[in-house]
Structures are given as structure tokens and as C-alpha cells.
Amino acid sequence: MPVTDSIADYITRIRNAGRAKNKTTDIPYSKLRENISQLLQDKGYIKNFTVITTEKFPFIRIELKYTASGEPSIKEITRVSRPGRRTYEGKDIKKYLGGLGLYILSSSKGVITDKEAREQGVGGEILFRIY
């Protein structure tokens, strides 16, 4: 069955793997998903990711990060903009949870956080929020 919303699929796989306490999860490859994974790694939400190419199709293997008590480092991850209802923000993006969480945006500068968007003075489509 084809996936109509690849970002929602990405988010759901990470959320489910965290709840199941899995060390890794595999996600079908796309350049956008790779860019999002790089951003999440840079911000400390995931431990590592690797792009793996097989004979059939490439995929991204994400190593999840957990706290010392064994809880996932991603407490909440929620899709904001959906195929049926796109959500865009200008350069005056509000902070998520007073700056504790992040909005992840797709902008003309690539995949960036809400803080980076405010610093660069750009807006874009809010893909999801993470805390």
C-alpha cells in the first residue's frame, strides 16, 4: 500500500520505535527524510542515522537516543502541515513551548528549525513539532 504522507510515516515510525524501546528503526529513503534525520541528529534527538543501499531500495536506519532512565529523548513528535491542510508561517514564527521544543520547517533555505528561520528571516511550511 503506497504511503500518501511520507513525513507522517517517518514521524510515526520514530514514535512507535521509541515507545517499543527499539534501538533502531528503518525508514524508506528520500532526500527530505535524510535532511530531517541530519537535523534531528544535530539537535540531539536521535543518536545517529545511516543511509543503507540494498538491491531493492535504499533506506535510512535511525539509532534512537534514550535518557539514563531509559525514556526516549523524543517526548512528543507531531505532524503539523498535512497534505489536506498545509500550514505555512512567515518569518515571525512563534517559539514552540517557549523555546523548549522545535518546529521543523521546509523553507527556501532547506530543512531548518524555527530558531534558524527567525535568525535568517525566512518562513516556510511547518512540517512537524518535536519536544
UniProtKB/Swiss-Prot annotation:
Keywords: Ribonucleoprotein, Ribosomal protein, RNA-binding, rRNA-binding. GO terms for cellular component: ribonucleoprotein complex; ribosome. It comes from the Bacteria. One of its GO terms (biological process) is translation. One of its GO terms (molecular function) is rRNA binding. InterPro entries: Ribosomal_uS8, Ribosomal_uS8_CS, Ribosomal_uS8_sf. The keyword NADP does not apply. SUPFAM superfamilies: Ribosomal protein S8. Belongs to the universal ribosomal protein uS8 family. One of the primary rRNA binding proteins, it binds directly to 16S rRNA central domain where it helps coordinate assembly of the platform of the 30S subunit. Part of the 30S ribosomal subunit. Contacts proteins S5 and S12. HAMAP family: Ribosomal_uS8_B. This is Small ribosomal subunit protein uS8.
